[in-house]
């Protein structure tokens, strides 16, 4: 039975409107809007990529979206929150958990529902349980067990999931992030060997070696995440594929409710697709223009059709992955029947569907039934899909669509040729398209789950995080420093003998390291960037910067001699530069 009183519900998602509007964001937003319609108070915690170095406390801001308060974390692939392993920060951000702890204290929600925890971390589950708030999860991809979220290897083949100690994940991530030399060597290193090394590293049995903390963090990733999923009050799995993956990786099946997504559906009946003989077939692609989505497979297959028989509309953001988008444009060439249409507001999805005859989802990964498939079915548009479990659970070959072998250009071409040659086939498939679940029905199910949570068997032992102090409006000084040809031990900002702020956390600045090396200065680390928070007003020329080396020796520099944007040598092995500074802002002016 659904709750009969208004509740305060806190949703989380890795990225959100208005900048991001793919399937997970659309699902989260539609659930939020439907909950609000029913009188519940809804707020959202989300993430946003930041390429700038900033103090930890400055990584959070807020905004309003259609009557909902959205709390935003500006993440980056750098150490933060006292954690030095970037791999660990991605799935267990202590900084975000501390901020979430403060949100839970201030908002006092009745329910937390996670729609994605990428870059936010499963430490949020610790925080929710420590606050006594029931927490639920809807996995929209495989992030909880796969560091790339897709179970897809660099060569395009699908992955069975992490090995025992994540050694295959260590290899895969290294191949993606460490350049061509690592990729060339990696294929000759047995995964079993990497797995053994990762396991011994995680247990502390091996001595220090480069990237040791990152390898250990990767080895801990899956068991850490799965353990926390087993503390939840319910998991809403959208497909049997997702249920299988979760169960295979150790998630308690008693927690799982399998329920397909719901979508916003326009009222009224929708006419089946009809095509007049002699008119070209209009094929549509709607989605992220990234290689794993397979749009290149579609364009290659489409170009095998006689130009007069069909036209192709590609909807997606060309700037998300510009190199891939350029390759798509090259594949399309000057074909007059291929159109790149950009993006569109989700409210226009029915209008876009009305402008195509069939949707193609040529994915190269284990798609978890993208929302666009349900939107096509709602519009009675047959769907041509890759033969992956998450897709063929919804699309049956020859009934409401066609199915082809993933990545097989010829097989997809044959499907498209059939639709082009047989106008009546489109009508038959369209008639069989059944109305999918609506957002209203989906939220009905969620509210019933909230009222009757599921019980797992894993003992709960959540960590307790201290709430992150609210320092919005604090000032700061950012820059970089080298002490004795290495990263400093600490940097402090002084006014006379008073310490105004200090940090012992340093951020990657490969640009600084490389610049110094070009000038003949050897630097043993790229972790040279600093950000010092300052809570009281300051005059730049009255400050000193104290740079402490790993040896404990300290050098002090008067900032009156160093302007923002400038750098200076303290001696032949120590250097410092300033990037930015900001005065504290009073609360009244925020």
Question: Where does each model-flagged region fall?
Answer:
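Donor nucleotide-sugar binding/catalytic pocket of nucleotide-sugar-dependent glycosyltransferases
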Residues: 144, 164-270
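A conserved mid-protein helix/loop that constitutes part of the nucleotide-sugar donor-binding site
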Residues: 26, 290-304
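Short, structured helix-loop element that forms part of the nucleotide-activated donor/catalytic region
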Residues: 53-62, 248, 313-337, 348
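A charged, aromatic-enriched C-terminal amphipathic alpha-helix characteristic of glycosyltransferases
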Residues: 424-452
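N-terminal subdomain of nucleotide-sugar transferases
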Residues: 2-69, 131-133, 303, 479, ...
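Basic, ligand-binding patches in group-transfer machinery
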Residues: 458-590
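Short hydrophobic beta-strand element within catalytic cores of glycosyltransferases
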Residues: 358, 382-385
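Conserved acidic donor-binding segment of nucleotide-sugar-dependent glycosyltransferases
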Residues: 397-398, 402-409, 418-423
């Amino acid at each position: 039975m659904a709750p009969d009183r208004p509740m305060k519900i806190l949703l989380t998602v890795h990225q959100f409107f208005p900048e991001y509007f793919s399937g997970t964001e659309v699902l989260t937003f539609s659930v939020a809007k439907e909950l609000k319609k029913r009188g519940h108070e809804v707020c959202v915690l989300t993430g946003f990529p930041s390429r700038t170095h900033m103090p930890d406390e400055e990584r959070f801001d807020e905004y309003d979206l259609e009557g909902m308060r959205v709390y935003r974390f500006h993440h980056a692939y750098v150490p933060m929150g006292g954690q030095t392993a970037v791999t660990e920060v991605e799935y267990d951000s202590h900084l975000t958990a501390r901020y979430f702890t403060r949100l839970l204290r201030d908002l006092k929600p009745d329910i937390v529902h996670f729609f994605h925890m990428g870059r936010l971390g499963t430490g949020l589950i610790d925080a929710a349980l420590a606050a006594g708030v029931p927490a639920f999860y809807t996995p929209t991809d495989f992030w909880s067990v796969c560091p790339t979220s897709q179970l897809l290897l660099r060569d395009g083949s699908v992955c069975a999931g992490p090995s025992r100690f994540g050694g295959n994940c260590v290899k895969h991530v290294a191949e993606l992030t460490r350049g061509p030399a690592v990729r060339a060597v990696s294929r000759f290193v047995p995964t079993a060997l990497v797995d053994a090394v990762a396991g011994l590293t995680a247990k502390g049995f091996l001595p220090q070696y480069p990237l040791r903390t990152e390898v250990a963090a990767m080895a801990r990733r899956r068991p850490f995440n799965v353990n926390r999923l087993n503390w939840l009050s319910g998991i809403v799995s959208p497909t049997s594929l997702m249920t299988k993956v979760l169960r295979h990786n150790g998630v308690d099946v008693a927690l799982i409710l399998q329920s397909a997504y719901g979508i916003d559906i326009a009222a009224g009946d929708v006419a089946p697709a009809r095509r007049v003989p002699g008119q070209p077939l209009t094929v549509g692609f709607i989605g992220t223009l990234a290689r794993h989505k397979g749009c290149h497979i579609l364009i290659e297959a489409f170009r095998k059709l006689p130009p007069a028989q069909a036209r192709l509309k590609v909807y997606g953001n060309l700037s998300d992955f510009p190199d891939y988008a350029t390759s798509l444009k090259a594949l399309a060439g000057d074909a007059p029947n291929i159109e790149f249409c950009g993006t569109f507001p989700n409210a226009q999805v029915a209008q876009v569907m009305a402008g195509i005859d069939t949707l193609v989802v040529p994915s190269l990964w284990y798609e978890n039934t993208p929302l666009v498939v349900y939107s096509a079915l709602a519009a009675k548009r047959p769907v041509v899909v890759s033969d992956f479990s998450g897709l063929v659970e919804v699309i049956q070959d020859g009934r409401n669509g066609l199915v082809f072998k993933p990545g097989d250009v010829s097989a997809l071409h044959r499907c498209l040729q059939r639709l082009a040659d047989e106008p009546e086939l489109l009508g038959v498939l369209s008639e069989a398209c059944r109305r999918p679940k609506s957002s209203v029905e989906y939220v009905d199910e969620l509210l019933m789950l909230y009222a009757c949570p599921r019980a797992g068997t894993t003992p709960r032992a959540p960590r307790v995080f201290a709430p992150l102090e609210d320092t919005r409006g604090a000032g700061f000084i950012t820059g970089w420093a080298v002490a004795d040809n290495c990263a400093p031990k600490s940097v402090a900002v002084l006014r006379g003998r008073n310490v105004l702020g200090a940090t012992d956390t340093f951020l990657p600045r490969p640009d600084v390291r490389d610049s110094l090396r070009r000038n003949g200065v050897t630097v043993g680390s790229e972790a040279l960037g600093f950000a010092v928070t300052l809570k009281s007003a300051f005059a730049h020329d009255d400050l000193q910067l104290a740079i402490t080396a790993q040896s404990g020796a300290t050098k002090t520099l008067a900032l009156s001699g160093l302007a923002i944007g400038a750098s200076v040598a303290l001696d032949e092995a120590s250097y410092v530069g300033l990037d930015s500074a900001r005065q504290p802002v009073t609360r009244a002016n925020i």
